[in-house]
UniProtKB/Swiss-Prot annotation:
Subunit: Heptamer of 7 subunits arranged in a ring. Interacts with the chaperonin GroEL.
Keywords: Chaperone, Cytoplasm
Protein purpose: Together with the chaperonin GroEL, plays an essential role in assisting protein folding. The GroEL-GroES system forms a nano-cage that allows encapsulation of the non-native substrate proteins and provides a physical environment optimized to promote and accelerate protein folding. GroES binds to the apical surface of the GroEL ring, thereby capping the opening of the GroEL channel.
Protein name according to UniProt: Co-chaperonin GroES
GO MF annotations, alphabetized: ATP binding; metal ion binding; protein folding chaperone; protein-folding chaperone binding; unfolded protein binding
Cytoplasm as UniProt keyword: yes
Organism: Prosthecochloris aestuarii (strain DSM 271 / SK 413)
Coiled-coil regions, chain positions: none
SMART domains noted in UniProt: Cpn10 (SM00883)
One of the GO BP terms on file: chaperone cofactor-dependent protein refolding
Lineage of the species this protein comes from: Bacteria, Pseudomonadati, Chlorobiota, Chlorobiia, Chlorobiales
One cellular-component annotation, GO: cytoplasm
Subcellular location: Cytoplasm
SUPFAM superfamilies reported in the protein's UniProt record: GroES-like
PANTHER family attached to this UniProt entry: 10 KDA HEAT SHOCK PROTEIN, CO-CHAPERONIN GROES
């Protein structure tokens, strides 16, 4: 991947959507919910404060994170789907 986020942005690879219900029924593409978690694949340099100091990012490549249902901008690169979002759009890190 050749995407490098700027400032306090991160690039997240969303988890795949559920293919079937717990009862075993297959979900059509139109009925699938977008996942609200994924893995960070790239991290920007950090947010620039008003005094010019760069604030270090709190997330790292490879971490699994939770984010809002409508967070980020969807992009497709080389056939892969990604979300570009600000670090502040991330709610939590999954251990």
């Amino acid at each position: 991947m050749n995407l490098k986020p700027l400032a306090d942005r991160v690039i997240v690879k969303p988890a795949p959507a559920e293919e079937k219900t717990k009862g075993g029924l297959y979900i059509p593409d139109t009925g699938k919910e977008k996942p609200q978690y994924g893995e960070i694949v790239a991290v920007g340099t950090g947010k620039v404060a008003e005094n010019g100091q760069v604030l270090e990012m709190q997330v790292n490549i490879g971490q699994k994170v939770l984010y809002g249902k409508y967070s980020g901008t969807e992009v497709t690169v080389e056939g892969e789907d990604y979300l570009i979002m600000r670090e502040s759009d991330i709610f939590a890190i999954l251990d």
